[in-house]
Amino acid sequence: MNKYFKVFFFVLLTHALKSALIFGQATLQKGLSLDIDKDSKATDRLVVKHFDSDKQGYKAYTFKKEGWEYVNVKHVYFGERLLRVGRDQDMKCDYVHYVKVFWKGELAPFLIKMKYYNWAWVSTRLHFRLTPELTWAEVFVPTIDENSEEGYMKLFKKRMDDFVSQVGEDRLATYKPFTEDPSKKRFDLTPTDEKEDTNKKKYVLMVVVVVVFVVVASLVVFLVKFCLK
């Protein structure tokens, strides 16, 4: 009886530890958390959701909070090649371009869609408030030599530079500069490290599972011995 119980105890303990590890790994997929201090009284926690579409060739970070919608449009991914929208440093203008690249089958020409996002009060200047009243602008970009990647990318870059410049000039002609409203609190975003906190939770959960299991196993042993008497 003792031998079988030890085997049973070992199997249950192994299963409990395995379940705890799997659960702990799953909690790592929360994404980036941001602390927003809107009223200088309490910090509001929200989670950034990550959307990735290789077929359409873009990545964007979006999050919503109390009717506000923001999107991080710093990088646009084109296959395995990374194209940058804006600069590595802080944006110098109060609007930003969001580009989605589409392939048309095996043909070299592709479609670019562009949409504007007005900058809101965010300290990093990488997040922008969505303005849904602005519509998409579609551009058809032909290529010089669809068999030459170098020529293709050069033309793409030139057409993109020209297009962004043209749209930017048209937009700035009617653009009203953003004015700070003293009655509204500035949004201060500070990225926090979720991994360290998640690891602590994982190990605490493992310890709790093991302790509970040992207590239950001890109780079972006591009951078995009591019944055998």
UniProtKB/Swiss-Prot annotation:
Domain of life, per lineage: Eukaryota
Record field: transmembrane: 204-224
Cell compartments where the protein resides: Membrane
Bilayer topology: Single-pass membrane protein
Membrane topology, Extracellular segments: 20-203
Keywords: Membrane, Signal, Transmembrane, Transmembrane helix
Species this chain originates from: Theileria parva (East coast fever infection agent)
Protein name (record): 23 kDa piroplasm membrane protein
Ranges of the Cytoplasmic topological domain: 225-229
Signal peptide: 1-19
A GO cellular-component term linked to this record: membrane
